[in-house]
Amino acid sequence: MDKRPNILWLCTDQQRWDTIHALGNSFIDTPNLDRLCRQGVAFTNTYCQNPICTPSRASFLTGRYPSSINANINGACNLPEHCTLITKRLADAGYYCGLVGKLHITSAWNDYEPRMDDGYSYFCYNLASGHHLNSPGNPYVEWLNQKGVDWHDIFTSDEKHDYHWY
């Protein structure tokens, strides 16, 4: 039996530690994140190396400062060839790595760039046209629709909803 730990690495852009109920925010409900905090590790004394999503992701996946790996703005990140992502190192060590969401660590500034050797065996990336939720084929909107929820109601209402996705 494999005794290596199972690693679930969640990245939520611009989310502070105090936006999770289990870590002290009594105003919101985050039951799934609360359960992860109870059963895993919650880092409550950490700092983000860059407030912009692409440089931040590139930094924590390479272990390097964004300025040292040409990851300074969104959409124009061209990592040097010598940079190896932690996911590639994990895959080389026998882990099965998967990505769901968006990564944005290869350049899309002028044209589509092929994926780097990132170590992901499963890669479910969808960036709906122009970051818009209502773009055709957006899996998140389709999932909401299957649940009988109109995303407009969630994002345009001042009401507190009883949706527990986080």
Task: List the predicted regions and their residue ranges.
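Catalytic-site neighborhoods of secreted/periplasmic enzymes
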Residues: 64-166
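Active-site segment of extracytoplasmic enzymes that catalyze sulfate/phosphate-ester chemistry
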Residues: 9-11, 17-100, 109, 118
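Extreme N-terminal starter segment of soluble prokaryotic enzymes
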Residues: 2-8
